[in-house]
UniProtKB/Swiss-Prot annotation:
Membrane topology: Multi-pass membrane protein
Domain of life: Bacteria
Protein name, as recorded: Putative metabolite transport protein HI_0281
GO MF: transmembrane transporter activity
Keywords: Cell inner membrane, Cell membrane, Membrane, Transmembrane, Transmembrane helix, Transport
PANTHER family from the UniProt entry: INNER MEMBRANE METABOLITE TRANSPORT PROTEIN YHJE (PTHR43045:SF2), SHIKIMATE TRANSPORTER (PTHR43045)
Species of provenance: Haemophilus influenzae (strain ATCC 51907 / DSM 11121 / KW20 / Rd)
């Protein structure tokens, strides 16, 4: 095999990281806009809570579209290669984000505004569905022996980078132009400016060599005509296990970002059931707190990769999942009648745990599948988990809080942690798996 097919570590890091950075940049600017802007710009109801729920429901649309993207891009990623497929997913994902920044609002085109917003959100979701699996494979299939989880943190580090850049952009726009300008028109700036990240990502990925693991499988004639169907017929068990291993991670991330922001900035009033609907913390204050916690997120992703290579993915994640459950049950201590200080403590602790659970996933999920279905299998597990862990949370977390308080949301997180814990118990350690042999 020619040595030109090997990629240097810096290129692997950038190629895998940039797409995930765009993914989470897209996710968070959309989540922030759904809370701050879309509820008034794209939806027209006399009930503010209804507008909030409709706006956050569009956030959930992408999670439903992700498995479609997983099947589509997974099929081509396992048939024609990781590189070409990653380029296509990046164009769809990034292009949809830019178009959102150009959409007219409800006052300009009426009901077509939320319809077009939903179409773009579905486009984002389909592109996102093919992004992470390919990025994880670029990292792990190019990793040296014994460092697969460490290399797997490259795409995962894109998450705090995207989170930081997205929040930083919103913070600067709001600070420099004011909140009124942000709500009226300046919210478009982060969406349109994402074209710069897409351009960087395309440049790096177009200069990348195909994974040597995929090339070896291709030379051995291991390519399949319908890899997605093979995942469901021959590799259903690892896909189900992988899906539930990822569920708690998604739930935690959604609650740490979208729910925490919506709850923190909502005026401090009571629901009909007598529970607090919010804390009344200014949006810029919360954004500043989240910026700092995003740095903590990144630090603990790197730590998790080191320990997942040292002690194993399964053992590491079992302990971290227990911590997620404990955090869920402790949520009222931080958020009920909370202050900026207690919210900050919640964000820092939660993002540290988030880094520890998210970090090893780019190594673990691909290790569950053989090369000929690895893109499809890892992508499907990752994105099916988003429906259970994030989509449902997006649709019901505010209602749970209104009916049962913060404790209800915390119990929901703990239940998701329990599902992940049981999936980990049902799994096997994959640290020493040879990706060219399975």
């Amino acid at each position: 095999m020619s040595t030109q097919l090997r990629n240097n570590p810096m290129k692997v890091a950038l190629a895998s990281m940039v797409g995930t950075a765009i993914e989470f940049f897209d996710y968070y600017i959309y989540a922030a806009a759904a809370v701050l802007v879309f509820n008034t710009q794209f939806f027209h109801s006399d009930d503010p809570l209804s507008n909030d729920l409709l706006s956050l429901s569009t956030l959930a649309l992408a999670f439903f579209a992700r498995p479609i993207g997983s099947a589509l891009f997974g099929h081509f990623g396992d048939k024609i290669g990781r590189k070409k497929t990653l380029v296509a997913s990046l164009v769809l994902m990034g292009g949809s984000t830019v178009v959102i920044g150009l959409l007219p609002n409800y006052a300009q085109i009426g009901i077509w505004a939320p319809i077009l917003l939903c179409v773009c959100r579905v486009g984002q979701g389909i592109g996102l569905g093919g992004e992470w699996g390919g990025a994880a494979l670029v990292a792990t299939e190019n990793a040296p022996e014994g460092k697969r989880a460490w290399y797997g943190t490259f795409p995962q580090l894109g998450a705090p980078i995207g989170l930081f850049v997205a929040n930083g952009t919103f913070f600067l726009v709001s600070y420099l132009l004011g909140h009124n300008a942000l709500v009226e028109w300046a919210w478009r700036i982060p969406f349109v400016s994402s074209i710069l990240l897409v351009a960087v990502g395309l440049y790096v990925r177009l200069t990348l060599h195909e994974s040597h693991v995929f090339v070896e499988a291709e030379q051995k004639g291991k390519k399949l005509n319908a890899p997605v169907s093979v995942v469901f017929t021959k590799h259903l068990k690892p896909m189900v296990i992988g899906t539930f291993i990822m569920v708690a991670t998604y739930s935690l991330f959604y609650i740490m970002t979208a729910f925490a922001q919506a709850y923190s900035r909502t005026a401090p009033k009571l629901s009909e059931a007598g529970y607090a609907l919010g804390l009344g913390i200014p949006a810029n204050t919360f954004t500043g707190l989240l910026l700092i916690s995003a740095i903590v997120f990144g630090i603990f992703i790197s730590i998790s990769g080191f320990y997942a290579d040292k002690i194993g993915r399964r053992k590491w994640l079992i302990w971290v999942t227990i911590a997620i459950g404990v955090l869920g049950l402790a949520m009222p201590l931080f958020l009920e009648n909370g202050t900026p200080v207690s919210v900050f403590a919640f964000l820092v602790i939660g993002m540290a745990i988030m880094g520890m659970t998210f970090g090893p996933m780019a190594a673990l999920l691909p290790e569950l599948f053989p090369t000929e279905v690895r893109y499809s299998g890892a992508s499907l597990a990752y994105n099916l988990a988003s429906i259970i862990g994030a989509t449902i949370a997006a649709m019901i977390s505010l209602k749970i809080n209104a009916s049962f308080g913060v404790m209800g949301v915390g119990i929901y997180l703990a239940i998701n942690a329990l599902m992940t814990f049981l999936a980990l118990l049902a799994s096997k350690e994959t640290k020493n798996v040879d990706l060219t042999e399975i």
